[in-house]
Amino acid sequence: MCSEVTQHLTEDIIPFWKSLRDDENGGYTGFVGYDLKADRKAVKGCILNSRITWFFANAYTLLKDSSLLEEAAHGFAFLRDVCWDRTNGGVYWSVNHDKTPAETLKHTYNQAFSIYALSSYYEASGDREALDLAYQLYDIIEGRMRDGSGYREAFDEAFNEIGNDKLSENGVMASRTMNTL
């Protein structure tokens, strides 16, 4: 079974995600239709790019294929250079295909996924900059998103609390949910 899973990973899953790489604008394509056609001009979710970066970093750690580390480095560069808010800190919700911010809100869930990506990339590559950014996000979560009762979830780009409607598919809006840290 292990060889079957490894074969599926290396012959199907990894090539699929590699095919979504955007060398022109960075990161990975934000939308693929049911027909598997990528929309290269779609908005790019920073969570999606964090997850893809995490995936390639961990795939490299497992398989030791240098092309996987290069994919993780590509994702890391996109998180650092495009998704990162250089004025207020933290990671945007999404960016346009042309590298401009699409939705500038900051969500605790999104910051946490970026920590996963950055720490996994650091573990795979030894790139200290990734670890430093992960620590910066941790400090943001603890310093700006936490209050005396726990963690608030949704903020504008300057970390003023806003309505939390990003993770609810059923219309339930709450300042705290179980879908965070």
Predicted regions and their residues:
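Glycan-recognition and catalytic cores of secretory/periplasmic carbohydrate-active enzymes
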Residues: 1-181
